Amino acid sequence: MRNLGVWIEIGGLQTYVGRIIGEKEEDARFSYAEEYLSGNIARPISIHLPLSANAFSVDDTRNFFEGLLPEGFTRRCVAGLLHTDANNYLSLLAGLGNECLGAIKITDENNEVVNADYQKLTIDEVSQLAREGAMETAELVTKSHLSLTGASGKVGLYYDENNKDWYLPKGSAPSTHIVKQSHVRLDGIVTNEQLCMMTAGNMGIEIPESFIVNVGDGRDEEVLLATKRYDRAIKDGLKKINGLSVPYRLHQEDFSQAMGISAHNKYESDNAGYLKMMFEIIRQKSFNPIADQLKMWDICIFNYLIGNTDNHIKNVSLLYDEELKTVRLAPAYDILSTVIYTSSTRDMAFSIGNEYDIKKITRDSFRREAANIGLGEQMAMKRFDYLANAFPDALNKACDELLGKGFNKAIDIYERIRDRRREFIS
């Protein structure tokens, strides 16, 4: 029998929410605790898991909580280290749930309690992280009991900005940055993502702070991408561990979780209408629905312009305030040009104007999609034209900034993006 406690941080305090109970993952169901429901701070932990005294279905339970876990090779590696099956999401949650994306924490009474702490990393250890593969990263993730979604090799670390030192969180200690490795099959991916994120920022799209950590001469095996977590915040007067201010957690959920869709179905098929569903959630739930619809539309356009076909529904999220009272569209993240790699698909993760193939998507496709999702045509196409016209200069500026910092790989990525755009975008 699995009996996992579910907690969420509200206003900086860990609050018991409920439990996931089941003999195995095939019958595990989440339910809110009676004391949580009767309290004056009760808030849903997901749009798809509204406050209810009834236990949620097996599928609804799995779709939300499995969405907190790593995917792909990293997940298989972590499962091996935890001596469990990669499909056993309950065991993975029990092993990694101390520090998840957002403000959720998972506890297992059978696990030894690990005190919250920060372990300072030496320069050599940071360098080793850059040079090691996904298996070694999975070991670090397992040791820190930290769960980050996605399939790439990444780990949550604490960055002391004043002293430029990195720390590995232990137990329930929150991280401040998500740190990604290069990818053995996708050359220049760290520079690629940083270039794309900077380009988006130059065009007025909200992005989290990020920077390249160079532990050598800037080669792929010597760089890491550090992204400041928008779901963590540091305020004056916070608790300290070893002299370090402990950030408080802000809750978030990706659109796969908010829509109640399994992570296995994060890529749309058969014109299922994912984008329309996302816009409907924004209209109904955002505290500023007009602004967030425009932000979402800008992100869709930018993914097309930059050639990001990995724009699935787990790569867009909703961010809650610290009291879980309001929700808004989170900053854009995980944006890179996938089309510069020959192994990538040309199909976007969801259709635009009933088209998936990026080579077949046109300005008119966006006009049709605007009508489909309920955006005014004049406003929607004005944004499209503005971003399309601003894109070349924004990309060039981002490239120059990276070159100025000594990241010479940027010019190669820039030229490949430019050349692929000429092929795909008429």
Task: Name each model-derived stretch.
Residues 1-313, 317-426:
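Phosphate/dinucleotide-binding and metal-coordinating scaffold of catalytic cores
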